[in-house]
A protein has these predicted regions:
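Conserved beta-strand hairpin/beta-sheet module of binuclear metal-dependent hydrolase folds
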Residues: 1-46
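Active-site HxH/HxHxD metal-binding segment of metal-dependent hydrolases
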Residues: 35-82
Length: 82
């Protein structure tokens, strides 16, 4: 079963998602826009273990906290080459 959590982050209200596999509690963070602390809170509340960050595209409002979140969890970032 998959669960989806979301937060609206940053100056332009970008949607950041946490996709959680409830069978193993692993998750993927999508578009960590801003406010790493808010992302960490969302992860803690879900009880999940992030496995990766997925960027839908490279605009500033979708990647603002990507490196900090990557370093915090020791996970990789995946993005399209476009």
């Amino acid at each position: 079963m998959i669960k989806i959590e979301s937060r609206v982050l940053g100056p332009v209200g970008t949607n950041c998602y946490l996709i959680i596999n409830k069978e193993n509690n692993e998750s993927i963070i999508i578009d960590p826009a801003d406010s790493p602390e808010s992302i960490y809170d969302m992860v803690v509340r879900s009880g999940s273990k992030p496995q990766a960050i997925l960027l839908t595209h490279g605009h500033f409002d979708h990647i603002g906290a990507a490196n900090e979140v990557r370093e915090h969890y020791g996970i990789k970032i995946y993005a399209s080459c476009d």
